[in-house]
Amino acid sequence: WMSSYQIFSNITGCFVPGMNYSKIEEVLELFLQTITRRLEENNFYEIPPFRHYEEKCRNSINKILKSYGYRLNELEIDEFYKMVIAVLFDETFFGAAFKISGYEKKKYRKYEVMISRILDAVLEDYNDNVREFLQTILTVWLSDKVKVKSKINALILMHGEHSASSMASLANEMIGDYVYEAFDMPIQVHTEDLIVKVNDYVRDIETNEGLVLLVDMGSLER
Protein backbone atom coordinates (compact mmCIF):
# COMPACT_ATOMS: atom_id res chain seq x y z
CA TRP A 1 0.00 0.00 0.00
CA MET A 2 1.36 3.40 -0.99
CA SER A 3 0.35 6.57 0.84
CA SER A 4 -0.98 9.66 -0.92
CA TYR A 5 2.38 11.33 -0.22
CA GLN A 6 4.50 8.46 -1.51
CA ILE A 7 2.67 8.26 -4.83
CA PHE A 8 4.00 11.67 -5.87
CA SER A 9 7.45 11.32 -4.32
CA ASN A 10 10.05 13.32 -6.29
CA ILE A 11 7.54 14.16 -9.03
CA THR A 12 8.61 17.81 -9.01
CA GLY A 13 12.20 16.81 -9.74
CA CYS A 14 11.80 17.77 -13.41
CA PHE A 15 11.83 21.43 -12.34
CA VAL A 16 15.35 22.63 -11.57
CA PRO A 17 16.73 25.86 -10.07
CA GLY A 18 17.36 28.68 -12.52
CA MET A 19 14.49 27.85 -14.87
CA ASN A 20 12.67 30.76 -16.49
CA TYR A 21 9.11 30.66 -17.84
CA SER A 22 10.23 29.29 -21.23
CA LYS A 23 12.12 26.38 -19.65
CA ILE A 24 9.21 25.62 -17.32
CA GLU A 25 6.88 25.45 -20.31
CA GLU A 26 9.15 22.85 -21.93
CA VAL A 27 8.74 20.36 -19.06
CA LEU A 28 5.08 20.93 -18.15
CA GLU A 29 3.78 18.28 -20.56
CA LEU A 30 6.16 15.66 -19.15
CA PHE A 31 5.12 16.69 -15.63
CA LEU A 32 1.43 16.17 -16.45
CA GLN A 33 2.06 12.83 -18.16
CA THR A 34 3.98 11.58 -15.12
CA ILE A 35 1.20 12.67 -12.76
CA THR A 36 -1.47 10.90 -14.82
CA ARG A 37 0.55 7.71 -15.07
CA ARG A 38 1.15 7.52 -11.32
CA LEU A 39 -2.51 8.16 -10.54
CA GLU A 40 -3.65 5.46 -12.96
CA GLU A 41 -1.08 2.90 -11.80
CA ASN A 42 -2.13 3.29 -8.17
CA ASN A 43 -5.85 3.93 -8.66
CA PHE A 44 -5.68 6.91 -6.32
CA TYR A 45 -8.32 9.11 -7.94
CA GLU A 46 -10.94 8.48 -5.28
CA ILE A 47 -9.02 9.00 -2.04
CA PRO A 48 -10.53 11.78 0.13
CA PRO A 49 -7.63 14.30 0.11
CA PHE A 50 -7.45 14.24 -3.69
CA ARG A 51 -11.23 14.48 -4.05
CA HIS A 52 -11.25 17.44 -1.67
CA TYR A 53 -8.91 19.47 -3.86
CA GLU A 54 -10.65 18.37 -7.03
CA GLU A 55 -13.94 19.74 -5.70
CA LYS A 56 -12.32 23.01 -4.65
CA CYS A 57 -10.80 23.44 -8.11
CA ARG A 58 -14.05 22.64 -9.90
CA ASN A 59 -16.02 24.99 -7.65
CA SER A 60 -13.59 27.91 -7.89
CA ILE A 61 -11.71 28.13 -11.16
CA ASN A 62 -14.37 29.21 -13.64
CA LYS A 63 -16.13 31.44 -11.12
CA ILE A 64 -12.91 33.42 -10.84
CA LEU A 65 -11.92 33.31 -14.51
CA LYS A 66 -15.39 34.54 -15.50
CA SER A 67 -14.52 37.97 -14.10
CA TYR A 68 -11.63 38.13 -16.59
CA GLY A 69 -13.66 36.95 -19.58
CA TYR A 70 -12.44 33.33 -19.70
CA ARG A 71 -13.37 29.78 -18.76
CA LEU A 72 -11.62 26.41 -18.80
CA ASN A 73 -13.11 23.15 -20.05
CA GLU A 74 -13.38 20.04 -17.88
CA LEU A 75 -10.15 18.51 -19.15
CA GLU A 76 -8.23 21.71 -18.41
CA ILE A 77 -9.63 21.90 -14.89
CA ASP A 78 -8.60 18.26 -14.45
CA GLU A 79 -5.03 19.15 -15.46
CA PHE A 80 -4.98 22.06 -13.02
CA TYR A 81 -6.19 19.89 -10.15
CA LYS A 82 -3.65 17.16 -10.90
CA MET A 83 -0.77 19.63 -10.77
CA VAL A 84 -2.00 21.06 -7.47
CA ILE A 85 -2.22 17.68 -5.72
CA ALA A 86 1.08 16.49 -7.20
CA VAL A 87 2.94 19.41 -5.64
CA LEU A 88 1.02 19.35 -2.36
CA PHE A 89 1.57 15.61 -1.89
CA ASP A 90 5.19 15.32 -3.05
CA GLU A 91 6.86 14.29 0.21
CA THR A 92 10.28 15.17 -1.23
CA PHE A 93 9.30 18.67 -2.37
CA PHE A 94 11.76 21.36 -1.32
CA GLY A 95 10.95 24.12 -3.82
CA ALA A 96 12.88 25.44 -6.78
CA ALA A 97 14.65 28.76 -7.16
CA PHE A 98 13.27 29.80 -10.53
CA LYS A 99 14.88 32.77 -12.28
CA ILE A 100 12.15 34.93 -13.78
CA SER A 101 13.27 38.15 -15.47
CA GLY A 102 11.52 41.47 -15.08
CA TYR A 103 10.49 41.26 -18.73
CA GLU A 104 8.85 37.87 -18.20
CA LYS A 105 7.11 39.06 -15.04
CA LYS A 106 5.49 41.88 -16.98
CA LYS A 107 4.65 39.66 -19.96
CA TYR A 108 2.92 37.03 -17.81
CA ARG A 109 1.54 39.39 -15.18
CA LYS A 110 -2.16 39.00 -15.98
CA TYR A 111 -1.89 35.22 -15.92
CA GLU A 112 -0.14 35.50 -12.57
CA VAL A 113 -2.95 37.67 -11.19
CA MET A 114 -5.58 35.11 -12.23
CA ILE A 115 -3.64 32.17 -10.79
CA SER A 116 -3.06 34.04 -7.54
CA ARG A 117 -6.80 34.51 -7.05
CA ILE A 118 -7.49 30.85 -7.84
CA LEU A 119 -4.84 29.63 -5.39
CA ASP A 120 -6.30 31.90 -2.71
CA ALA A 121 -9.54 29.94 -3.12
CA VAL A 122 -8.03 26.46 -3.47
CA LEU A 123 -5.10 26.30 -1.06
CA GLU A 124 -5.29 26.12 2.69
CA ASP A 125 -2.34 26.35 5.08
CA TYR A 126 0.68 25.67 2.91
CA ASN A 127 4.10 27.27 3.20
CA ASP A 128 5.39 30.01 0.95
CA ASN A 129 7.63 27.65 -1.05
CA VAL A 130 4.66 25.52 -2.09
CA ARG A 131 2.55 28.54 -2.93
CA GLU A 132 5.31 30.25 -4.93
CA PHE A 133 6.13 27.06 -6.85
CA LEU A 134 2.50 26.44 -7.81
CA GLN A 135 2.04 30.12 -8.67
CA THR A 136 4.94 29.97 -11.12
CA ILE A 137 4.22 26.72 -12.95
CA LEU A 138 0.46 27.34 -13.12
CA THR A 139 1.02 30.85 -14.49
CA VAL A 140 2.94 29.32 -17.40
CA TRP A 141 0.34 26.59 -17.82
CA LEU A 142 -2.58 29.07 -17.90
CA SER A 143 -0.85 31.18 -20.56
CA ASP A 144 -1.28 28.21 -22.91
CA LYS A 145 -4.97 27.69 -22.06
CA VAL A 146 -6.37 31.22 -22.27
CA LYS A 147 -5.02 34.04 -24.41
CA VAL A 148 -5.02 37.62 -23.21
CA LYS A 149 -5.53 39.49 -26.47
CA SER A 150 -5.57 43.09 -25.25
CA LYS A 151 -2.15 44.74 -25.28
CA ILE A 152 -3.44 47.89 -23.60
CA ASN A 153 -3.82 47.93 -19.82
CA ALA A 154 -6.88 49.69 -18.43
CA LEU A 155 -7.46 50.54 -14.78
CA ILE A 156 -10.73 51.55 -13.12
CA LEU A 157 -10.53 53.55 -9.87
CA MET A 158 -13.70 54.16 -7.87
CA HIS A 159 -14.72 54.69 -4.27
CA GLY A 160 -16.73 51.92 -2.71
CA GLU A 161 -16.08 48.42 -1.39
CA HIS A 162 -16.62 46.62 -4.70
CA SER A 163 -17.64 49.34 -7.17
CA ALA A 164 -14.55 49.28 -9.39
CA SER A 165 -14.17 45.49 -9.17
CA SER A 166 -17.78 44.91 -10.21
CA MET A 167 -17.47 47.26 -13.17
CA ALA A 168 -14.17 45.74 -14.33
CA SER A 169 -15.51 42.20 -13.96
CA LEU A 170 -18.65 42.94 -15.97
CA ALA A 171 -16.71 44.72 -18.71
CA ASN A 172 -14.17 41.88 -19.03
CA GLU A 173 -16.94 39.30 -19.13
CA MET A 174 -18.79 41.18 -21.89
CA ILE A 175 -15.60 41.70 -23.90
CA GLY A 176 -14.36 38.15 -23.35
CA ASP A 177 -10.85 39.34 -22.53
CA TYR A 178 -8.84 40.56 -19.54
CA VAL A 179 -8.73 44.28 -20.29
CA TYR A 180 -9.78 46.04 -17.09
CA GLU A 181 -8.31 45.90 -13.62
CA ALA A 182 -9.74 47.65 -10.60
CA PHE A 183 -8.78 49.59 -7.51
CA ASP A 184 -11.61 49.77 -4.98
CA MET A 185 -10.82 52.88 -2.96
CA PRO A 186 -11.85 53.54 0.65
CA ILE A 187 -14.09 56.57 1.04
CA GLN A 188 -11.42 58.47 3.00
CA VAL A 189 -8.49 57.75 0.67
CA HIS A 190 -6.10 60.65 0.07
CA THR A 191 -5.07 61.60 -3.45
CA GLU A 192 -1.40 61.14 -2.55
CA ASP A 193 -2.05 57.54 -1.47
CA LEU A 194 -3.89 56.89 -4.70
CA ILE A 195 -1.01 58.26 -6.78
CA VAL A 196 1.45 55.97 -4.97
CA LYS A 197 -0.78 52.97 -5.63
CA VAL A 198 -1.16 53.78 -9.32
CA ASN A 199 2.59 54.34 -9.71
CA ASP A 200 3.28 50.95 -8.10
CA TYR A 201 0.83 49.36 -10.53
CA VAL A 202 2.44 51.06 -13.54
CA ARG A 203 5.87 49.74 -12.56
CA ASP A 204 4.54 46.17 -12.70
CA ILE A 205 2.91 46.32 -16.13
CA GLU A 206 3.93 46.71 -19.75
CA THR A 207 2.96 50.21 -20.93
CA ASN A 208 4.45 50.30 -24.44
CA GLU A 209 0.96 50.01 -25.95
CA GLY A 210 -0.52 52.60 -23.61
CA LEU A 211 -2.46 52.77 -20.35
CA VAL A 212 -6.07 53.82 -19.85
CA LEU A 213 -7.13 55.19 -16.45
CA LEU A 214 -10.85 55.52 -15.69
CA VAL A 215 -11.25 57.50 -12.46
CA ASP A 216 -14.35 58.38 -10.45
CA MET A 217 -13.42 62.06 -10.35
CA GLY A 218 -16.49 63.11 -8.39
CA SER A 219 -15.19 61.45 -5.25
CA LEU A 220 -11.56 62.59 -5.43
CA GLU A 221 -10.21 65.45 -3.36
CA ARG A 222 -10.15 68.81 -5.09
Task: For the regions a language model picked out, list residue spans one by one.
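A cross-family "folded-core" feature that marks the main globular domain of proteins
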Residues: 1-222
